[in-house]
């Protein structure tokens, strides 16, 4: 049976609990994914600590990458065996296997590892938002991507 890390109360790392989960089958516009790598983000610590309150108990984690095990009805853009990455709610990326809506998943190109894909999603989306929405980057301007230097 797959396992998932959940929190039942707020606190430090000691509140993370490993539990067996019954994943089931995907519904319409959903995919069942086996995660091969997860991304760890500051927001995960905010959720765990209660700084960003959650309804408890709750899964935790926003981003991961893995392989599709099963596709639900109406899914045409993904197939069983596709490598994908995702970042968004619902929380629960700290799982061996889970079901996610297709709208939060993207295919991972050949040559990109699950580890790379899992760590790029939230940071990449944040960077895209900052340079395309918050401040429109202009020609000859310089940007330092501090959150991406670990890759």
Where are these regions (language model features)?
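Extreme N-terminal starter segment of soluble prokaryotic enzymes
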Residues: 1-3
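Conserved small/polar residues in nucleotide/adenosyl-binding loops
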Residues: 150-151
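Glycine-rich beta-strand-centered segment in the early N-terminal region that forms part
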Residues: 22-39, 49-92
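Cytochrome P450 core scaffold surrounding the K-helix E-X-X-R motif
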Residues: 43-45
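Exposed loop/turn and edge beta-strand positions of beta-sandwich/beta-sheet ligand-binding modules
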Residues: 17, 29, 62, 102, ...
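NAD(P)H dinucleotide-binding glycine-rich loop of Rossmann-like/cofactor-binding domains
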Residues: 86-147
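Conserved hydrophobic/aromatic beta-strand scaffold that supports enzyme active sites
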Residues: 18-23, 65-67, 97-99, 105
């Amino acid at each position: 049976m797959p396992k998932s890390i959940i929190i039942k109360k707020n606190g430090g790392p000691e509140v993370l609990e490993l539990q067996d989960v019954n994943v089931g089958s995907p519904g319409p516009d959903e995919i069942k994914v086996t995660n091969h790598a997860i991304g760890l983000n500051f927001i995960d610590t905010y959720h765990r600590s209660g700084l960003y309150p959650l309804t408890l108990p709750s899964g935790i984690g926003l981003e991961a990458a893995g392989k599709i095990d099963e596709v639900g009805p109406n899914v045409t853009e993904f197939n069983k065996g596709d490598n994908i990455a995702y970042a968004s709610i619902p929380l629960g990326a700290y799982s061996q296997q889970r079901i996610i809506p297709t709208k939060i998943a993207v295919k991972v190109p050949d040559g990109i590892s699950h580890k790379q894909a899992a760590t790029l999603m939230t940071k990449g989306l944040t960077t895209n938002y900052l340079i395309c929405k918050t401040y429109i980057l202009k020609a000859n301007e310089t940007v330092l991507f501090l959150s991406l230097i670990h890759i």
